[in-house]
Amino acid sequence: MANKTDFQVVDISMKITNQLPKVIITDELMVTVNNRKNNILNIQAMAQEFEKKKEDEMAFMTKGLEMLVGASATAKIEEMDLPLPEYKMLYETIMGVAIGTYGEEQTPSR
């Protein structure tokens, strides 16, 4: 059984910045990503609802972007009229930044 002297102090204060990440999309468009816990939980709940209702994937992605970067930035992204692969890549990048997985190596599951 562990006693009080077996534990050490772990300082994570340097890892907590409380700053929102930013993503540069074009030279003219940089967005701030709302990666707050409650916002991500709301997106996850929305994903479950969309899945139950078999809603349109694009409608979900657009609503998710609005929640992550705001309606104004989402409107600017929509105005770009990106090809679908680039739109999905943009969405996946912003979502990856929001949940902290951007830049991690993606390996296919077996």
Language model features with spans:
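Short, charged/polar N-terminal "headpieces" of proteins
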Residues: 1-45, 109-110
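Generic detector of solvent-exposed, compositionally biased contiguous segments
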Residues: 29, 34, 66-69, 83
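Charged, low-complexity surface segments at secondary-structure and domain boundaries
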Residues: 26-30, 45-51, 73-79
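Acidic, aromatic-enriched beta-alpha/helix-loop junctions
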Residues: 38-71
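C-terminal charged interaction modules
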Residues: 2-7, 75-110
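Residues that form generic nucleotide/phosphate-binding pockets
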Residues: 15, 46, 64-68, 76, ...
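Polar/charged alpha-helical tracts
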Residues: 11-14, 45-48, 59, 75, ...
